[in-house]
């Protein structure tokens, strides 16, 4: 029996199994078609970027490993991203950091960046049906230090304020050109290695910096703000903590970013979704896999990621959440890393959408705890993978592990020769 026939037969069985618990698999497939990931450009080159005078990676983040074949320039990075996207079902976005501008070999300091430096990206995105998102970049620069937007040195603080203002202008042009808002994330590494006696001072400075940055209103971009529990070399204090950004986001009606690696390992990011959605307009996700710290391992279909996507579906918040990925593993094939992590996130969403939520809520409303728990457990064994396989088949991408050989071929013909 041909593989396509097996996929079709398995799907037909899944349709009946899910119908028995009140789930419409065709509706799930249609919803999945509108589920767009924002692929992070920095997996392709280990967060190096294209600045002429690029600094070493800093800001408490690390890309570990030295697998051969990383992208060395803008053309290679674009080619690798397109290759990865060809194995990911559906249409997706691309998330750029400011250091990935098309600087044409010129020295452009961070406070001098202009929309023109991303003109070729905008054109590329249109050509390949890939809308763009954006990030300001506070790390890997001579003025990064331990503090950027919260720096008491007014000259340095204003440098980063100007940088971030200009990044918002770039994001506005991206959104205008693509006819869809560009989501611009703001994360700064600011913090202290050892005990500080000025917590309030630095947070007041960050608050003032953000107010200056967000003073200009734009129609074609949306801001989101991201916290972190700590970074390497900044273990004792992080200015932009979770509490800080929740307060700022709620008081300023700003989108909050939840990076799954930016919390204590015992915290549930999924549990934060329902609370935040009561107070902020939208959420941005940076889906990663923290191993003991914010290690940015490749996303997999693990319990925390599954719980996160289930909670979004249960909250009825599909339209209020934006789905970005944020990991960078330099120890394995980078195109493979993109595909594994992206498809893992999509698998989690597929399973979340297939949950028999109506029946589960009926049990809960009736106080039928045994029945609710029993169905939650039995649902795990339902053939969600047959629905996922059909989604891949409908989108003309490899089903199952077939992409492995394709990526090996690209490595042999392209990346291994770099």
From Swiss-Prot:
Transmembrane domains' residue ranges: none
Single GO MF descriptor: manganese ion binding
Sites where the protein binds Mn(2+): 262, 294, 296
Keywords: Cytoplasm, Isomerase, Manganese, Metal-binding, Rhamnose metabolism
Annotated family: Belongs to the rhamnose isomerase family.
Name this protein carries in UniProt: L-rhamnose isomerase
Note on how the cofactor is bound: Binds 1 Mn(2+) ion per subunit.
Top-level taxon of origin: Bacteria
